[in-house]
Amino acid sequence: GLAAALAAEGAVVVGGNLAAVRGDEWWSLTLLGSVARGRAWTRAGARPGDLLAVTGWPGRAAAGLALSRLESPEAFRAASDEAWKPLLEAWLRPRARVGFALALAPAGAVTAAIDVSDGFAGDLARLCEASGVGCDVHARSLPVDPPLERATGALGLSFTTLRFGPSDDYELLLAIDPGRRDACERAARESGTPLVFAGRFTDRRGELSLVTADGATRPLEPRGFDHFAGER
């Protein structure tokens, strides 16, 4: 398809918002920038032993979207409650972690990076695939999120589904050199960015595992938003 058409002209896809949509109207926005040679953060480069750093509150946007789709009057009133405001804000007004990224970039601590635009597990899987590594995610190290926990009952969705499934949060998943962890924590403090170290990259290529609070390990399914579901 697209790759073959570009190949005929000696061109390649370097990124962008590729999707299949139905309907007469759609919007797309592309931003271009520049970075010094060798300083760009890419998905490739994570190494076994690197730390997994996570900004903010992954899963909130998914909960906000689900709340916005509730149809009954009782459910609508619940979604309008102040308790749900952080979830609706995450979906309606996401904020990229630009200040944190600018504060962290000079430290040279990041070996690979991706933003959570399709879902925590799905985007982490893409980073691992590009880097040729796996990752163990520790549930106990992820941020406690009372609004997200409360939403599970109202929505009938599990916390795991909201936290790791499809969600356009625009938080960052970073592979961090263990020797430069302090620099990452300092950048988070300086920029006022919530940050946790939630796991470690492994040599088990493509394998994502969730280490539960009781120490058990189970596969973490790489679920994320499917941009081409509309054509199937």
Regions found by a protein language model. Give the residues of each.
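Glycine-/charge-enriched secondary-structure boundary and capping motifs
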Residues: G1-V14, L18-W27, L31-L32, P106, ...
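Short, acidic (Asp/Glu-rich) active-site segment that either coordinates a divalent metal cofactor
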Residues: W26, W41-A103
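Short alpha-helix capping/helix-loop boundary micro-motifs
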Residues: A36-A40
